[in-house]
Amino acid sequence: MNVILLGAPGAGKGTQATKLVEKYEIPHISTGDIFRSNIKGQTPIGVDAKSYIDKGQLVPDEVTVEIVKNRLNEDDCQKAGYLLDGFPRNIFQAEELDKFSNVEKVVNISVDLSKLLKRITGRRVCSKCGESYHVDFLNGKTDCARCGGELIQRADDNEETVGKRLAVYTEQTQPLIDYYEKAGKLITVNGDQSIDEVFAEICEKLG
């Protein structure tokens, strides 16, 4: 099974990816992980990618496509398929992906953006152990139930930054949603449900 997972920051994509790769026994292909392993292994394409990252520049589409292509050509993906996360990010990447891999389904976890904003800006993390909480369930507590550490809001979880991230995501992703909808591959799932309900809906629609 060859599946792409789409979802805005805070939509629970990572949680669903973990559950899906367990159920369907397919490798979870995250572009961030592939970049890190290529850079760490100092592969020619990893060295190329690092040269852009070190300058604070975006890695060109052609380099990203090549890194993903190499990973999808490995034995585990050839045998079992994949769950692709973080790629494609634009139409060029989607069209290139279609040239070397048959994408079967594209799962879009759709979440009400105002609820998403509340979910992310209300997030608090323990400064010591990293445990995550939400202000709605803290009842005014300011310390971690696990280790007693101070609960803080991440610098990039403020309303202005989150709002910008969501706007960029929507602008980038809507053309992809349209692209895969036209191809008859799009599955839209209601991400405002509980984790288990979202998972059940994805599995039902994947068949």
Per-region residue spans from a language model:
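P-loop (Walker A) phosphate-binding loop of NTP-binding proteins
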Residues: 8
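NTP-dependent small-molecule kinase module
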Residues: 150-207
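ATP-dependent NMP and nucleoside kinases share a basic, alpha-helical "lid"
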Residues: 84-132, 136
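Conserved lysine of the Walker
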Residues: 13
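ATP-dependent small-molecule kinase phosphotransfer cores
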Residues: 27-102, 125, 154, 199
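Cys/His-rich short segments
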Residues: 118-163
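Hydrophobic anchor at the beta1->P-loop junction of P-loop NTPases
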Residues: 5
